[in-house]
């Protein structure tokens, strides 16, 4: 007889195979396990980038990205609205 954890996992796997996202950050995975791996990789990728740029540069880059819309980039909107974005912080640390 399957344990409760195995049963829950198989239910999540069948939902994932139907195209639903069952793991936060696992969008696009065709199975529960695939979604777990995608979410883990995305998280690790963000952490690596944060370490490369430093806390300040990473948050500054997020500010610029948050300003973007379908019509214009974050840089264009920042310039138009007079928002100061310090791109010197974007450089990776050596």
UniProtKB/Swiss-Prot annotation:
The keyword Transcription does not apply. GO terms for biological process: response to abscisic acid. Residues 1-16, 33-53, 74-94 have a biased composition (Basic and acidic residues). Keywords: Stress response. Residues 1-94 are annotated as: Disordered. Pfam families: LEA_5 (PF00477). Induction: By abscisic acid (ABA) and osmotic stress. Wheat contains at least 10 different genes for Em protein. It is thought to provide protection for the cytoplasm during the desiccation stage of embryo development. Belongs to the small hydrophilic plant seed protein family. This is Em protein CS41. It comes from Triticum aestivum (Wheat).
